């Protein structure tokens, strides 16, 4: 297929994934027509919003669920390597957007912040030390520090050590080159850049309501203008569904075979936010603990310094909260409307297989503020009720699907790319670490669904992401070079301690 073949692409949803994919596509295929439709009145309102997500640069520096203890006691860090490389890829793309002038003021969406792991108990301390020993041997993580010394911990996490009377087994590890990322602000910047670009149309308060496959192979997308109630149709070659929790219902409306035997289980996140500036100023890190035994990885608690609206904040959580909505601004009928004759056995099988997760979720629902505060005090013993308030964050929809390997009703953690056989429909489903790995997800979409353009697009992608086609895991010199460059481009001020 010749590069002169002009195509039309519809992007659904103005979150971080759609705006990332759109930003990339308009650069490598500037003559293509791109139409982005968002049902809300502005971009980044749902899961991408800074108040609705965990806000971390998921780089596997402190998240302990990415480093798994094996039956022989060893620590497998392969997943951590993969996640870290993906975040480095994201930073390269963001740095390109800044250098090219497409977005400005990187400090408004990314700031340096130490990433720390903190554990208590003999077994957890041994796990963290073994993890440290495994990670420091690998160049990607060789700047990791570890301590069991209380005085050192007082320097790293002074707020958490205040009033701590349990002087038993405790340990912490730290990597200074972590970040806090405001994905809402990043999304807004990318959306505005798209709106200002030729051959790109961005429409807010426009809801995609249905699809029809045409005899010429194209899709007729039915769109409702929520400003005046008018419905119109738009013909397109490709449909990209990046609508967060709304992706599964939209995918089902396409009727493609790949939309069958898929379901979703909606979970809200709740955090408690500190309202006392004097407390907020005493903590300067993102601190992860270890998930309680028998609970899913999304339950890992963390105490996070966050930068929101230019101000420093402090959040603790998440706590799960189940409900039928697939989106924060969704309908209480979302879950029930997604149950179809072709996926009901998938959902029922999942319910039987995942009773502990369901029990955990409902236990969390009935947790009061007092319960949240008691959990917080395992991190910050002197926490006072009057300094904290509970708020509901965004929705995540855990993907439930049938697989050959895991049978019916398997719950998929992470981000899932689903596409039609002819690659005309592409949907992004799932959750964490989606935002942090959004650039790698966009690259996967390009490689998987547009192979005929790969040769022509590669030089342009390489300009945006210098490590494209190479491994930051295997090539240590390239990894160090890229980190130094992105630190400069994004004004992070990091330096590589490794020799």
UniProtKB/Swiss-Prot annotation:
The Enzyme Commission number assigned here is 1.1.5.4
Q: Which GO terms describe its biological process?
A: tricarboxylic acid cycle
* InterPro entries on file: FAD/NAD-bd_sf (IPR036188), MQO (IPR006231)
- Per its UniProt entry, what is the enzyme's top EC class, as one word? oxidoreductase
Catalytic activities: (S)-malate + a quinone = a quinol + oxaloacetate
Signal peptide interval: none
Q: In which pathway does it act?
A: Carbohydrate metabolism; tricarboxylic acid cycle; oxaloacetate from (S)-malate (quinone route): step 1/1
Per UniProt, the keywords (alphabetical) are: FAD, Flavoprotein, Oxidoreductase, Tricarboxylic acid cycle
Is this entry keyworded Oxidoreductase?
yes
Q: Which cofactor does it need?
A: FAD
Q: Which GO terms describe its molecular function?
A: 2-hydroxyglutarate dehydrogenase activity; L-malate dehydrogenase (quinone) activity
Question: Which family would the database say this protein is a member of?
Answer: Belongs to the MQO family.
PANTHER family noted in UniProt: L-2-HYDROXYGLUTARATE DEHYDROGENASE, MITOCHONDRIAL (PTHR43104:SF2)
* The name this protein goes by in its record: Probable malate:quinone oxidoreductase 4
